């Protein structure tokens, strides 16, 4: 029993020795291992205080990472660093807005810069050697693997494989908003903008001892830039940066006012507009993908892109966009952008979108327009305030009136004596055929006859309160000077040319007037002057050869545009009347009636009548009656159209401005009215006479040279407001009675004014009485076949005039007898 107990004790002692030896061997082994790790840790390029506290796993992790980095560095062609480069190395990381990270193709972080602690809260030694997938968001792992993959397959000819990488990565961050460090288990996700490239290292030592070649080493070199939250921006924004807030559809809801200085936009005009309207077209695809990442990961930075300026061109901008979430339901609420403008406006004269054309199309108010508005204000301003406004612009001070005591220098617009008459005539303001008197003596001597008004008669102003259409500016231009009671007009001196050799005898009917004053007739209350026929014919005739320089202006100036304005309410309306007694006895009178009987005064008891008195020598009247009234003609006669509205809106207008005027203005006949109508045979002594004629065709009859002159006349333009030639020259519209198949016509008369002319010896005084338009229409309105007379418009008067001459017209006593019967 004792032997068995001693053996057991020996076994226990041997086992304890073995355990002790094992513990000593393990202790020795650990100590040797620790010595090895200690020596290895001290071999790492780490500070002593860091390397002395590293565990074995960290030493192994860091050593492996270090060996890989050394392998990468040995594969490259590295230059020997000089002292200057060594000193600059410490500034590189400070210049970066992020940290540097090198990943293997497996995702291991073989190198990370020591400033990662500043941005992520994690130290360099905590991350080096670890897999990047241990610190990144699980939703980003797939994208991360795609970025690490380098395809070694065949590449199309002419193209290189893209090795550039740019993506957004969410990584764990242990930093709080206050800058404190938290536990890794409580870390939040921070978005990093990672940009870099894949680098392939092909070393010479890839050939192993076994004979196979190792693949080249591939790594991804990245610069990771964290995107700051707008609420955590500590650095003040400079003048080249502006803030903006957008809705989830990227429409502006707020914009900083600094955008006005940078791009020209006003913050108010951007509200409600989509940011996509202001992107350059070439950057829209890139920005669309960036906004996709923003809604997925919460934050993005766009990189540099082009944004259109307001007035053309674009600027380069880099934007940091952040999605703001609602604190209650964690739903996205809006987007806040920090925009950094990195350039000025480029190609400012180039238009890229319709928004940039709005400012081009909008009129810009110039300084001249402001000055005009300043003087056209209705309310009167104080002179001192006006001076204060104008003194800011020195050129505008010339518009102020001189102060009291200043010397006023009168402006002399007279011409020098060395100027020719033709140069002076170009400066003469012509108002149709009526011209205000000129102060220049030379102009008065160039065939300009002045017809003074009597001292007892003062010309009435052209302004009329009853006529609102009368322009004040026109009235001021046409109103005669109160200091000068003289009016003058110019008329080309013409010579009648015979239409054929057989018409040569008609040129001796009357001497040619020497001055325009012979065209004027004085209207006396006694109606004792007689009417000069030939002068009236020449008044409305125009010759091709002029005797003074004024005739050269007939084709250059639109004189009718400068004629005195006549309100329409001064004339009589065309109206339709009931049927009166027929004029059957008035159509069969002979043509050889005496001219004197035509001008006999007719006793009328109707109120106001217009009288025209003229003077003519007895020799002239004898010449007129020589050929049996051949020279007495109807200048204008109108057939009535079959269908005319009863009440046309147009009204004839008088060519004279006022009843106080005493100067007749001769107007030239226009081709727009005469070219189809003035081929008739002369039958009437005056264009102011009333006649009833029958329409016949006589191509074999000879044409009077006086009517030829009227036929060939050309007028510049038609009178506005449906006015015809007869309204312009003051010719009373005439009534023509055609054959049985023609309809009768009723037209209104014009009031005619005359001016005083010098009396001649041996004159006989005759008087012609012109009946007002209403009375004449009532007297002549009845027809034999019609129940009423249709109204005539100016178009009917101009188009439906007779082409050939008229025969068998009522003359002299027959005409007056017909008028008496109607009365």
Curated annotation (Swiss-Prot):
InterPro entries: bHLH_dom, HIF-1_alpha, HIF-1_CTAD, HIF_alpha-like, HLH_DNA-bd_sf, PAC, PAS, PAS-like_dom_sf. The keyword Cytoplasm applies. Residues 531-575 are annotated as: NTAD. The modification Phosphothreonine is found at residue 555. Residues 783-823 are annotated as: CTAD. The modification (3S)-3-hydroxyasparagine is found at residue 800. There is a cross-link at residues 532, 538, 547 (Glycyl lysine isopeptide (Lys-Gly) (interchain with G-Cter in ubiquitin)). Residues 494-517, 651-666 have a biased composition (Polar residues). Pfam families: bHLH_HIF1A, HIF-1, HIF-1a_CTAD, PAS, PAS_3. Induced by reactive oxygen species (ROS). One of its GO terms (biological process) is positive regulation of transcription by RNA polymerase II. Residues 17-70 form the bHLH domain. The modification S-nitrosocysteine is found at residue 797. Residues 85-158, 228-298 form the PAS domain. The keyword Phosphoprotein applies. Contains two independent C-terminal transactivation domains, NTAD and CTAD, which function synergistically. Their transcriptional activity is repressed by an intervening inhibitory domain (ID). This is Hypoxia-inducible factor 1-alpha. It comes from Bos taurus. The gene is HIF1A.
């Amino acid at each position: 029993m004792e032997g068995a107990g001693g053996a057991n004790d020996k076994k226990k002692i041997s086992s304890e020795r073995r355990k002790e030896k094992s513990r000593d061997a393990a202790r020795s082994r650990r100590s040797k291992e620790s010595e090895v790790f200690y020596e290895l840790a001290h071999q790492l390029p780490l500070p002593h205080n860091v390397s002395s506290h590293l565990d074995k796993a960290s030493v192994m992790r860091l050593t492996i990472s270090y060996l890989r980095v050394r392998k990468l560095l040995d594969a490259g062609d590295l230059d020997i660093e000089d002292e200057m480069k060594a000193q600059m190395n410490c500034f590189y990381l400070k210049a970066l807005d992020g940290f540097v990270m090198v990943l293997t193709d497996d995702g291991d972080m073989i190198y990370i810069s020591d400033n990662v602690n500043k941005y992520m809260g994690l130290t360099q030694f905590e991350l080096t050697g670890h897999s990047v997938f241990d610190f990144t968001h699980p939703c980003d792992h797939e994208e991360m693997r795609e970025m690490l993959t380098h395809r070694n397959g065949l590449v199309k000819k002419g193209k290189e494989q893209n090795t550039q990488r740019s993506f957004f990565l969410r990584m764990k961050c242990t930093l709080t908003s206050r800058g404190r460090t938290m536990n890794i288990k409580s870390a939040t996700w921070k978005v990093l903008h990672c940009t870099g490239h894949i680098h392939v290292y092909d070393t010479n030592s890839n050939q192993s001892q076994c004979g196979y070649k190792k693949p080249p080493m591939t790594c991804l070199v990245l610069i990771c830039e964290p995107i700051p939250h707008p609420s955590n921006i500590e650095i003040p924004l400079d003048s080249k940066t502006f803030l903006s807030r957008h809705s989830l559809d990227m429409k502006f809801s707020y914009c900083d006012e600094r955008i006005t200085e940078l791009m020209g936009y006003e913050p108010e005009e951007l509200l409600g507009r989509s940011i996509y309207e202001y992107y350059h077209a070439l950057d829209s695809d890139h920005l669309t993908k960036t906004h996709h990442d923003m809604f997925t990961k919460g934050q993005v930075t766009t990189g540099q892109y082009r944004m259109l300026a307001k007035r053309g061109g674009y600027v380069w901008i880099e934007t940091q966009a952040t999605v703001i979430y609602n604190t209650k339901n964690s739903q996205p609420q809006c987007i806040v952008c920090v925009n950094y403008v990195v350039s000025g406006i480029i190609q400012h004269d180039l238009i890229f979108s319709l928004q940039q054309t709005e400012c081009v199309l909008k009129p810009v108010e110039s300084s001249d327009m402001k000055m005009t508005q300043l003087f056209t204000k209705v309310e009167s301003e104080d002179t001192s305030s006006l001076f204060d406004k104008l003194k800011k612009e020195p050129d505008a001070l010339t518009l102020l009136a001189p102060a009291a005591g200043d010397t006023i220098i009168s402006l002399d617009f007279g011409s020098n004596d060395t100027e020719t008459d033709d140069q002076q005539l170009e400066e003469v303001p012509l108002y149709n055929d009526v011209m205000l008197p000129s102060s220049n003596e030379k102009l008065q001597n160039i065939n300009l006859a002045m017809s003074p008004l009597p001292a007892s008669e003062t010309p009435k102003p052209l302004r009329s309160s009853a006529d609102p259409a009368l322009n004040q500016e026109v009235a001021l231009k046409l109103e005669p000077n109160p200091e000068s009671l003289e009016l003058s007009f110019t008329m080309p001196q013409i010579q009648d040319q015979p239409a054929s050799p057989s018409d040569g005898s008609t040129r001796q009917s009357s001497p040619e007037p020497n001055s325009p004053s012979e065209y004027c007739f004085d209207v006396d209350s006694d109606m004792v002057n007689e009417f000069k026929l030939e002068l009236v014919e020449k008044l409305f005739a125009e010759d091709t050869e002029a005797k003074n320089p004024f005739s050269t202006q007939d084709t250059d100036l639109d004189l009718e545009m400068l004629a005195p304005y006549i309100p329409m309410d001064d004339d009589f309306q065309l109206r339709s009347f009931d049927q009166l007694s027929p004029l059957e006895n008035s159509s069969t009178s002979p043509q050889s009636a005496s001219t004197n009987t035509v001008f006999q005064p007719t006793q009328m008891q109707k109120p106001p009548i217009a009288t025209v008195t003229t003077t003519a020598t007895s020799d002239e009247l004898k010449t007129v009656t020589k050929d049996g009234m051949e020279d007495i003609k109807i200048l204008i006669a109108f057939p009535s159209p079959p269908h005319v509205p009863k009440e046309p809106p147009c009204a004839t207008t008088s060519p004279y401005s006022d009843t106080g005027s005493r100067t007749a203005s001769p107007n030239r006949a226009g081709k727009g009215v005469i070219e189809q109508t003035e081929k008739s045979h002369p039958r009437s002594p005056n264009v102011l006479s009333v006649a009833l004629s029958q329409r016949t065709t006589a191509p074999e009859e000879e044409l009077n040279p006086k009517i030829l002159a009227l036929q060939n006349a050309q007028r510049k333009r038609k009178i506005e407001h449906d006015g015809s030639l007869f309204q312009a020259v003051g010719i009373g519209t005439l009534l023509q009675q055609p054959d049985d198949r023609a309809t009768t016509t009723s037209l209104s008369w014009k009031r005619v004014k005359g001016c005083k002319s010098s009396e001649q010896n041996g004159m006989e005084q005759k008087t012609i009485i012109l009946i007002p338009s209403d009375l004449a229409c009532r007297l002549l309105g009845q027809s034999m076949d019609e129940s009423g007379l249709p109204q005539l418009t100016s178009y009917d008067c101009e188009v439906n005039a007779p082409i050939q001459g008229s025969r068998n017209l009522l003359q002299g006593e027959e005409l007056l007898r017909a008028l008496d019967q109607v009365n």
